[in-house]
């Protein structure tokens, strides 16, 4: 009889991170996947990171996960998005060579102690005494465990649509998980349907690259992993093209043949990654939509046309593509398609990602209503970690909204649910000044060390980095200038007689360590990476102190009761939409009000201030 502590179902991004995290705790872990060769496959776009998503990858890496290291190994076009904006909203991103990425993930999994990889299909879960105790495999029968993590992606009752053609599949060329979906319903688990889509794949050789503008990689690529010292793969360029009036005419004339508009698809698609049909219908006034032509690998003939996903019939896809500049003679290697799949309302989960109605069953990834590799991987890590800790009799791990973007995402999912695929953005985090991509290790690696999931190499690397930063900070805090001394060097500060440290001067606009070396040459000894960390820390110091107070105040206010007599209509500045929702839901506390869909920190502040003012006025009357 095969027995493990934790079984992971699925070898996608969520499953790989779940398996690694579980095994790193010391738990005997099994990862069950259809095909060993498909572990870590990038099913859709050949890219990792982006706005909000890049923060998740950095956090996964800070917790010693896999995605950041694999992306650095496979990255072929690194770009730091929002580079000109503040550090809090900068988003690391890279295009990745599909084959190299998969190779990196599989290597990391093969090298992981306590991890056993099984090639088979899970067709049922085993439940004893209302608790999951294993899975049933199609070929090998029962295997048992203390907990199971389901990471089925788009495979659970997956259905591909191309025009009027529909067939069961998890992704193109792979079977759907139909039997498992039916068996799960027998345990009282109810499902919804979501949809996502992918564009056609094009032959690189048949594109007129010479007529198209290019997008270059950054000259100084910023890696994802705190362990990566240098990006080693050659950096490539992409090309940019656009749809046009002729493209739009073809789509409009054939919109009835799109699976999305014919009524064949019932699932809701991702708002922030619409199909080209949606773009034409919803933004008909635009004369064109941008398309990025992204190579899928260094030695690959396949091009991913980012921005033109579709479920139109194949003949229509070919026609519309040939109207686009540079693609007049393009050869389509694989048509675009939409895929529908089952998901579970994440409000049925606890914050450990365990299904409340079926103890021992944890869920991660698209089965929870999210979209994207990064969102899936982050959930997988937390689900695998909590599954292993539960089996080991250890306390559960819950990341708060003020600690990590992972905490923001999980709290959003559990408290608000989803009506469309959930995507991470920096705007979702109310404490984003402290949840930066650059300080993910400072926030999370010490926690991961406490949980026992960090390698000796990473912990040593982290300690060395912090020691360098502490030393540099100490130097800067001991160096002082008077306003007169600053003025003599061309630096204008308030002439108030107050001596200022080099550290405090770094918070001034357009100030940096390089400029301060004119006053203090000893600052030349600080290495470039430490300088960057020091400058960001100093720039945000005042704001972060204020944010700490806001976090502490919010934590105090969460327990504040909302009186049933509260006249919500009297709160000035609150939107009518929120007033209606509050009246309907009648939250009993600020913590309950936080969970209302659309609730913002600003709105909560208005409610808290109003309640506190009402209490003070009542106190005066008494």
From Swiss-Prot:
PROSITE patterns tied to this protein: GIDA_1, GIDA_2
Cofactor(s) needed for function: FAD
UniProt: FAD binding residues: 10-15, 122, 177, 366
Listed GO MF terms: flavin adenine dinucleotide binding
Entries under Gene3D superfamilies matching the protein: FAD/NAD(P)-binding domain, GidA associated domain, C-terminal subdomain, tRNA uridine 5-carboxymethylaminomethyl modification enzyme MnmG/GidA
Entries under InterPro entries matching the protein: FAD/NAD-bd_sf, GIDA_C_N, MnmG, MnmG-rel, MnmG-rel_CS, MnmG_C, MnmG_C_subdom, MnmG_C_subdom_sf
GO annotation, biological process: tRNA methylation; tRNA wobble uridine modification
Subcellular location: Cytoplasm
Record's keyword terms, sorted: Cytoplasm, FAD, Flavoprotein, NAD, tRNA processing
Residues engaged in binding NAD(+): 269-283
Keyword Cell membrane: no
A single Gene Ontology CC term: cytosol
Family, per entry: Belongs to the MnmG family.
HAMAP family listed in its UniProt record: MnmG_GidA
Record's subunit section: Homodimer. Heterotetramer of two MnmE and two MnmG subunits.
Physiological role: NAD-binding protein involved in the addition of a carboxymethylaminomethyl (cmnm) group at the wobble position (U34) of certain tRNAs, forming tRNA-cmnm(5)s(2)U34.
Name the record gives this protein: tRNA uridine 5-carboxymethylaminomethyl modification enzyme MnmG
